[in-house]
Amino acid sequence: MEPGTKYREKGNTRMTEMMQQLKKIGIVPVVVLNDAKDALPLGEKLMECGLPCAEVTFRTAAAEESIRKMAKAYPDMIIGAGTVLTCEQADRAIDAGAKFIVSPGFNPKVTEYVLKKGVPMTPGVCTPTEIEAAMEFGLDVLKFFPAEPSGGLKMIKALAAPYVGLNFMPTGGINAANVRDYLAYDRIVACGGSWMVAGNLVKEGKFDEIGRLVKEAADIVKEIRG
């Protein structure tokens, strides 16, 4: 049996459609919310200013409720859950309305669990061994994490060479100064970044500033990808 075949029938179409949508958006804001009350004003700025998506990390107690609020208020927004480490967290995220799941590393148990539910999953990898293990699940888009500390774009290009058809979503150390280089490489679907949704800006309620940074990021995508 071809690697990953048993997972494709249920989830591959959704995965492909999701990745096509994310490629158009280009940059996925990686959000850490400590208070669910910030979810709606943040979601509003993301929708209004050109990046209608978010990876809400499961690092805080407010993550689940934040996803639920954003998913209900902005049904057209592509909301995912990041830093998902367990099957229990995956269930909570999906039940709250997450449309895709992201993990910092490759956990076969969690990956299989999410894919069997037919939900798009992007596990993190940074070595050939991890890539090949993930490809056994039929995945052709993987998170490259942590991007900059692991060699950045140069490393991604080196890894991409032997794995024809594999694409990446790099996260970690990507910012307004280096994101153009990543976006210009055709094997990158989208970049994850938190500079436009920095925790201090959210905490201080500076949503107009967040909106400005989001628009600036969206304009970079247009500049590079048209």
Which residues does each PLM region occupy?
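Glycine-rich phosphate-binding active-site loops on the catalytic face of alpha/beta enzymes
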Residues: 104-110, 143-152, 187-206
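Conserved N-terminal beta1-alpha1 strand-loop-helix module at the mouth
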Residues: 11-96, 116, 176, 204-225
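Glycine-enriched alpha-helix->loop->beta-strand junction motifs that scaffold or abut catalytic
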Residues: 47-52, 73-76, 95-101, 116-122, ...
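Active-site glycine- and acidic-residue-rich loops that bind
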Residues: 168-176
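Catalytic beta/alpha-barrel core
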Residues: 31-32, 53-60, 77-85, 98-106, ...
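Catalytic cores of alpha/beta
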Residues: 86-96, 129-137, 175-189
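Anionic-ligand binding region
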Residues: 128-140, 152-159
